[in-house]
């Protein structure tokens, strides 16, 4: 009976010294409209970069991401998908970023921040909607899918009201 109250799909992970339990919503969003175009749900453990292949395809032409997305494997996948990389450059011990690289990362951050606005909206304006109490990845995937759809409806209404999109 205890097993039916326990989520065997969810996992614990630590990020910046804070422990998190549950699942992650990985999204692909349009950089101009901030609408979610694709999403993927995983337990909290896998690194964000592992889902990139499920979110990027030939219809995408640019990837904006932090330095966690910089790897040879991801760069190869982006070439195959004909997607241009705007991923932040990493500094290493003994090989820090140059001023040009820092400036380049700063420009990339302005666009990448638009994705963070989506999660901020879900947390602040949608009553902390990312905090879900469901058991099982199937239910969580359905809930997150509906959450992403609801966000898109809010955003679409805003785009129409601000006359950014014409019907």
Predicted regions located by residue number:
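Short, acidic/turn-prone active-site loops that include or flank metal/cofactor-
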Residues: 41, 89-93
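Polybasic low-complexity intrinsically disordered regions
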Residues: 1-79
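Active-site lining segments that contact anionic ligands and/or coordinate catalytic metals
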Residues: 60, 82, 141-144
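Acidic/polar loop patches that form or flank catalytic/metal-binding clefts of enzymes
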Residues: 62-64, 86-87, 162
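Short, charged, surface-exposed secondary-structure boundary motifs
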Residues: 50, 73, 94-101
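Short secondary-structure boundary segments
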Residues: 67, 89-90, 117
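Basic, amphipathic alpha-helical segments enriched in Lys/Arg and hydrophobic/aromatic residues
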Residues: 103-167
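Short hydrophobic/aromatic-enriched beta-strand-loop microsegments
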Residues: 81-89
């Amino acid at each position: 009976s205890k097993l039916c109250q326990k989520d065997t799909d969810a996992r614990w992970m630590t990020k910046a010294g804070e422990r998190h339990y549950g699942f992650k919503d990985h999204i692909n969003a349009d950089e101009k409209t901030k609408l979610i175009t694709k999403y993927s749900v995983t337990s909290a453990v896998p690194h964000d970069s592992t889902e990139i292949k499920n979110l990027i395809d030939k219809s995408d032409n640019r990837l904006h991401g932090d330095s966690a997305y910089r790897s040879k494997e991801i760069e190869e996948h982006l070439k195959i998908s004909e997607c241009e990389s705007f991923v932040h450059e990493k500094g290493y011990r003994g090989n820090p970023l140059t001023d040009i690289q820092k400036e380049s990362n700063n420009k990339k951050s302005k666009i990448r921040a638009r994705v963070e606005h989506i999660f901020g909206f879900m947390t602040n304006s949608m009553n902390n909607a990312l905090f879900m109490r469901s058991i099982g990845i199937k239910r969580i995937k359905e809930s997150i899918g509906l959450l992403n759809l609801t966000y898109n409806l809010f955003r679409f209404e805003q785009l129409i009201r601000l006359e950014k999109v014409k019907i």
